[in-house]
């Protein structure tokens, strides 16, 4: 029986050694390291991208920096492709991912999310001088510029629109501007970013869906202290005006709700 005791002791020791690495950095370890390691794409403007000088910038980048500052550490960004970004948490590559990660029930089964820090809605975009479309229902029989496989395309199709296929937001907007499409259903944040850079563009939001999609900071399960600290940091940056300043910089308005 001694060999069973030895085996059990060895297994317990191995579990103790492996647990911190498997569970990932906790709040104490983050503070001891002096850095919050954050996974992000770096290719998804205006959230996380490189400016003309090659510097990593964006809404999510500044939110990450603000959170880290409230934790008393620096933000250390580690870039990766979207397909493997969240899996990087499992590999213990970083402490959190801040990259417009939508809060879904499927993801919540495996990971923990902070409170939402940004909201987006499906909005109906038309030319500014178009008075024929005032609601999603008015799309019936109209041409809507959409990525054919997107949820937005399904919404337009469900409203009775004739879909005009596009590669994404920019092409959809151009088709509306040039009159080759009557409208597009797209993401509210993408539209705000577009209008921030082209305020005189002849397009407007005429309707929006009531239900918003929310994104949060995603971390490994089993790190309640880190999660609590991140949530407190989010509350604090909203209270002291930091969030509003970042939001205004990239979108011209508060995008938290």
Name what the model sees in each region:
Residues 119-126, 192-235, 251-257:
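Periplasmic-binding protein-like
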Residues 62-70, 130, 143, 150-151, ...:
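Extended ligand-binding regions for polar small-molecule ligands
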Residues 25-99:
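Extracytoplasmic small-molecule ligand-binding "clamshell" domains
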Residues 37, 43, 56-69, 123-171, ...:
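Bilobed "Venus flytrap"/periplasmic-binding protein-like clamshell domains
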Residues 65, 69, 74-138, 202:
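Acidic, polar ligand-binding/catalytic clefts
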Residues 111-123, 140, 157, 168, ...:
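Short Pro/Gly-enriched coil loops immediately N-terminal to beta-strands
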Residues 77-87, 131, 148-150, 164-178, ...:
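Short helix-initiation/N-cap motifs at beta->coil->alpha
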Residues 101-109, 155-158, 182-211:
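A ligand-binding cleft/hinge motif common to bilobed small-molecule-binding domains
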């Amino acid at each position: 029986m001694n060999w069973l005791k030895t085996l059990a002791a060895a297994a317990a020791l191995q579990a103790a050694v492996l647990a911190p690495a498997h569970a990932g950095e906790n709040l104490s370890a983050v503070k001891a390291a002096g850095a919050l390691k954050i996974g992000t794409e770096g290719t998804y403007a205006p959230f996380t991208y490189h400016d003309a000088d090659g510097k990593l910038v964006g809404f999510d980048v500044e939110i990450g920096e603000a959170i880290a500052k409230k934790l008393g550490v620096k933000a250390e960004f580690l870039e990766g492709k979207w397909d493997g970004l969240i899996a990087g948490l499992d590999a213990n590559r970083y402490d959190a991912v801040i990259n417009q990660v939508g809060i879904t029930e499927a993801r919540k089964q495996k990971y923990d999310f902070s409170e939402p820090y940004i909201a987006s809605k499906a909005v109906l975009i038309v030319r500014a001088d178009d008075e024929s479309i005032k609601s999603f229902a008015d799309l019936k029989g109209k041409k809507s510029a959409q990525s054919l496989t997107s949820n937005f395309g399904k919404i337009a199709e469900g409203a009775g629109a004739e879909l005009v296929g596009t590669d994404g937001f920019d092409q959809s907007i151009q088709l509306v501007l040039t009159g080759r499409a009557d409208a597009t259903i797209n993401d509210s944040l993408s539209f705000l970013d577009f209008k921030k850079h082209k305020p005189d563009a002849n397009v407007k939001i005429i309707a929006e869906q009531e239900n918003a999609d929310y994104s949060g900071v995603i971390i490994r399960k089993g790190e309640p202290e880190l999660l609590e600290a991140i949530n407190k940091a989010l509350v604090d940056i909203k209270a002291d005006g930091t969030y509003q300043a970042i939001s205004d910089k990239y979108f011209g308005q508060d995008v938290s709700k």
